[in-house]
A protein has these predicted regions:
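Phosphate/pyrophosphate-binding loop motifs in nucleotide- or prenyl diphosphate-using proteins
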Residues: 2-194
């Protein structure tokens, strides 16, 4: 049996990088419609893309295998989420995606000590990048909330980004622990100029 061929338009779109169709300040969505590049939808798509790239940067670091596998799975989910956002009315991220993240939070957090104070983002380079990814995830979530004020957004998509920032926090702690680094607790008495 021969493999199914991509529709000609899709194959052409993916092989041709410079199209000039966006030079007028609009961009094409997956359903063929065009929207302004400064629309809330495009902002959300860009924020999710930036988050995926930030996780890719984190994956360039030496990480424990379970962490790397988890992050790679998340990158696939984020690509699906970008697809969902690029086709109005399409749903790709489901409750099952959210549950998977919640399970991962529980699994990785089980090996960590309980926190009684806030921690400072940092530690190893990999843990620091996980904290950067966490903040980018929060920004992507805010972009989705802004978009939801004017057009439908899947409920699971918003919950996914919220849980993802929680997981990235836990993964930062996990990576530090694997490297033998302690969490640095925030201390109020250390605030202010010295």
């Amino acid at each position: 049996m021969l493999p199914r061929r991509l529709p000609r338009k899709m194959g052409h779109r993916l092989s041709k990088i410079v199209t000039r169709t966006g030079d007028n300040g609009t961009t094409g969505l997956g359903d063929g419609s065009r929207v302004a590049k400064d629309s809330t939808r495009i902002d959300a798509i860009g924020a999710v893309d930036e988050l995926n790239s930030t996780i890719g940067l984190l994956l360039a670091e030496a990480l424990p295998d379970p962490v790397a596998q988890c992050l790679t799975s998340i990158q696939h989910d984020l690509f699906d989420l970008g697809g969902e956002l690029s086709i109005p009315g399409h749903v790709a991220v489901t409750d099952a995606h959210v549950t998977r993240l919640e399970d991962a939070v529980e699994r990785f957090n089980a090996d960590l000590g309980a926190l009684k104070e806030f921690i400072l983002p940092g530690g190893t380079r990999a843990a620091s990048l996980a904290h950067v990814a966490r903040t980018v995830s929060r920004r992507a979530e805010r972009s989705l909330v802004r978009m939801a004020a004017s057009e439908p957004v899947g409920d699971a998509a918003r919950r996914y980004l919220n849980r993802l920032s929680d997981l990235l926090f836990v993964l930062a702690r996990t990576v530090n622990r694997a490297a033998g680094r302690q969490d640095v607790l925030w201390r109020k008495d250390r605030s202010g100029p010295r």
